[in-house]
């Protein structure tokens, strides 16, 4: 009764396991991982405090919808002498995306979604994922707050669990259109053609987008 109608449930992520001691002294989550968890894996919160991470620790994460619950737009125009500049903005708010396909919704699996949007460039950057210092030569890459967990081979059940780790705010504000108009008063040639006035107009669409979500559009 205290949960929203039609919601996505999942785990609360606590970042990534820092080292072997962090794994050893944390609640056991090998059941959902299907293997022993390792440093660099996503670490989940033991919500009910029983020392084991399982479905009983899942909580509501988001409304079960991939469309924004807030949509808005605004525009206007500025006039100066014979010039008129018009503009139109459109935006959304209160909308989440889970960047993993555990929900069978739009999103991507880390390291396996090819060239979807900016995914390849982001995951290829070693600074964005947990990497052992033995590989990188730099201890700072063992970052428990990295954007992506450690690189793994095959189906990684631990990293693809629905959780707050993959939850992203995908609100945006888009400059949808700019319209520039210049009015030509009727000169001698225009009058001879029977034209009282002439407007020259330039229109640009979908100019730019501001959003905290950078992986793909």
Indicate residue ranges for each PLM-predicted region:
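Conserved small-residue
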Residues: 1-66, 113-143
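Extracytoplasmic gating/loop element in the C-terminal half of outer-membrane beta-barrel translocons
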Residues: 3-7, 92-194, 198-199
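Extracytoplasmic loops and strand-loop junctions of Gram-negative outer membrane beta-barrel proteins
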Residues: 53-62, 158-165, 217
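Outer-membrane beta-barrel proteins
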Residues: 59-67, 99, 168-171, 217
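Hydrophobic, lipid-facing positions within transmembrane beta-strands of outer-membrane proteins
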Residues: 70-76, 175-180
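Strand-connecting loop/turn motifs
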Residues: 80-83, 195-197
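Repeated loop/turn-to-beta-strand initiation elements of outer-membrane beta-barrel proteins
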Residues: 82-87, 187-188
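Membrane-embedded beta-strand positions of outer-membrane beta-barrel proteins
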Residues: 87, 200-202
């Amino acid at each position: 009764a205290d949960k929203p109608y039609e919601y996505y449930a999942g785990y609360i992520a606590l970042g990534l396991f820092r080292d072997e001691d962090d794994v050893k002294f944390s609640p056991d989550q090998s059941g959902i991982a299907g293997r022993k968890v390792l440093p660099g894996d996503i670490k989940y919160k033991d919500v009910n405090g029983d020392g084991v991470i399982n479905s009983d620790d899942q909580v509501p994460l988001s409304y079960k919808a991939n469309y924004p619950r807030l949509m808005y737009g605004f525009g206007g125009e500025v006039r100066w002498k014979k010039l008129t500049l018009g503009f139109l903005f459109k935006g959304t708010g209160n909308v989440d995306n889970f960047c993993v396909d555990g929900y069978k919704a739009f999103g991507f699996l880390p390291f396996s979604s090819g060239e979807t949007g900016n995914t390849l460039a982001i995951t290829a950057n070693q600074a964005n994922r947990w990497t052992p210092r033995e590989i990188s030569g730099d201890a700072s890459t063992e970052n428990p707050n990295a954007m992506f967990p450690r690189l793994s081979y095959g189906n990684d059940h631990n990293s693809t669990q629905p959780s707050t780790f993959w939850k992203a705010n995908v609100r945006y504000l888009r400059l949808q259109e700019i319209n520039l108009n210049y009015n030509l008063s009727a000169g001698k040639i225009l009058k001879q053609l029977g034209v009282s006035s002439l407007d020259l107009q330039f229109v640009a669409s979908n100019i730019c987008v501001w959003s905290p979500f950078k992986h793909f559009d």
